[in-house]
Every structure is written in structure tokens, then in C-alpha cells.
């Protein structure tokens, strides 16, 4: 009888320890290095697994190497759930932030004002909305103000880009804003808008995948001319870059396995 009681006590303690261990398990969040998702995760004291892109953050969750991912709501809408690249993942109701997207140019660059005018014209004539519908982001689209009709400086970035004949756009693989189609061509809401800007400038366009954490260095070193990749307009970005008007609403959301 004593042996039986001892065995039952041991089993009870074992189950208690297992339950405690499960309760105290730390959730690991996959985030893109240098992103708004990483910033909010660090602010909340979450344990994180920083990766190169938000697409890789989803891969981490899908592979079981991270418990959850913090990504942009616009990407979650395009990549997560039934009929998407990740049908076994779900976007939870947990919304960590609400934010705005904008493009970033070199500090003091007149390219930002040029892009603003192009976006204003594209919004007014319906082109911007048509592109948004194509990529399913029409509900996030922000109304653009009237064009200012700003005149680029003779020695400014617009003249520099026109002189070299190519607009170099810094991006990451980030559907539905920038991603490759079946032919390996870059498409997406941001990519298509950037193509319109290049056309208005009278230059070719080149998309360059960048390390998101080094985007400001890439700009300042003139490796790229603009960051146009679902960039959140944080105080840090506004201080480091000449940013365009906001054009899309966004949020940081949590994605897990279903």
C-alpha cells in the first residue's frame, strides 16, 4: 500500500512538473531584422529570432523553428491562410501596432517630392486604386493630396537619377508589395508604383534586394535611390530619410500555426 501511495505521489509530481514546464514555455517570435515587427517585439520583451525577411519569418513558423511570426498585416493577408503559400498558418486577432507605409529617399532628396506628385496624379486618375485592387490592398489605400508641382533642383537627386538613366529601388521579397512573378520579374503594389515613377523620370528601373537592416546605409552610399518596400514611417525613418507621403495603412500582426 505504501509503495502504491509513493508511486502515485511520484506520478502526481511528474505531471505537475510537466504542466509547469509547458505553462512556462517561452514563445519565440520570428521577426525581420530592422523591421517594425522586431521593434515592437523588443519593446514588449519578447524572445525573438531575427531573420533576413518577413517571408523567412513565415518559413520559420511553418518549419516549427519559431512559435510565431510578427509581420505586416498586408503581407499576412496575401501569404497566410487557405489558398495562399502558407495554408496551415493563421493570422491571429492580435494587432500589436497600427502604422503607415511610405517610401524613403536620401535625406534632403527632391525625389521624395517628385514621388509625392506622381502618387497624387495616380490617385486622382484612378491608376493607384487599380493597382491596389490588383494586389488586394485597396482597403488599406490612403487618399493622396493634390500635387504640389514642385520643381526639381538642377543639382538634386532627380537630376542625378535622370543623368545616370536608372532609378534603383531597394526592396526585399515582400508580397504583395514587391515579389517576383513566374517569369522572375518584380511585381507588386510598390513595384508597380515605382515603375510609374521611373517612367515619369524618363529612366529605366532596377530593383535591388537589400539587407533591410542596412537600408539607410544603402541610400546614403548611393547603392540605391529609394527604399520602396512597405516601409513603416517610424520616427527613426523620418529622421534618417526624406520620406514620401503615407500611401497605405498597415499593422503588425501575429501569425501562428493553425
Listing of model-derived features with the role each one plays in the protein:
Residues 21-23:
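Bacterial signal peptide processing site
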Residues 1-9:
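Positively charged n-region of N-terminal signal peptides that target proteins for export
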Residues 44-54, 58-60, 72, 130, ...:
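Extracytoplasmic small-molecule ligand-binding "clamshell" domains
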Residues 77-98, 195, 199, 204-258:
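Acidic, polar ligand-binding/catalytic clefts
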Amino acid at each position: 500500500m505504501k509503495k502504491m501511495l509513493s508511486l502515485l505521489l511520484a506520478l502526481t509530481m511528474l505531471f505537475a512538473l510537466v504542466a509547469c514546464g509547458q505553462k512556462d514555455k517561452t514563445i519565440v517570435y520570428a521577426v525581420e531584422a530592422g523591421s517594425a515587427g522586431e521593434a515592437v517585439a523588443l519593446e514588449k520583451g519578447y524572445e525573438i529570432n531575427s531573420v533576413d525577411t518577413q517571408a523567412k519569418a513565415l518559413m520559420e513558423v511553418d518549419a516549427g523553428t519559431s512559435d510565431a511570426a510578427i509581420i505586416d498585416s498586408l503581407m499576412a493577408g496575401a501569404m497566410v491562410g487557405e489558398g495562399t503559400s502558407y495554408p496551415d498558418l493563421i493570422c491571429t486577432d492580435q494587432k500589436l501596432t497600427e502604422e503607415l507605409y511610405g517610401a524613403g529617399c536620401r535625406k534632403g532628396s527632391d525625389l521624395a517630392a517628385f514621388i509625392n506628385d506622381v502618387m497624387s496624379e495616380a490617385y486622382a486618375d484612378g491608376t493607384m486604386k487599380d493597382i491596389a485592387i490588383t494586389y488586394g490592398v485597396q482597403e488599406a489605400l490612403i487618399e493622396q493630396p493634390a500635387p504640389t508641382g514642385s520643381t526639381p533642383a538642377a543639382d538634386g537627386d532627380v537630376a542625378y537619377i535622370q543623368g545616370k538613366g536608372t532609378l534603383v529601388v531597394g526592396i526585399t521579397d515582400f508580397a504583395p508589395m514587391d515579389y517576383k512573378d513566374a517569369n522572375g520579374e518584380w511585381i507588386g503594389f510598390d513595384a508597380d508604383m515605382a515603375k510609374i515613377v521611373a517612367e515619369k523620370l524618363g529612366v529605366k528601373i532596377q530593383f535591388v534586394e537589400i539587407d533591410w537592416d542596412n537600408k539607410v546605409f544603402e541610400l546614403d552610399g548611393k547603392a540605391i535611390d529609394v527604399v520602396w518596400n512597405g516601409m513603416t514611417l517610424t520616427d527613426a525613418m523620418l529622421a534618417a530619410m526624406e520620406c514620401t507621403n503615407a500611401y497605405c495603412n498597415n499593422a503588425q500582426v501575429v501569425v501562428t500555426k493553425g
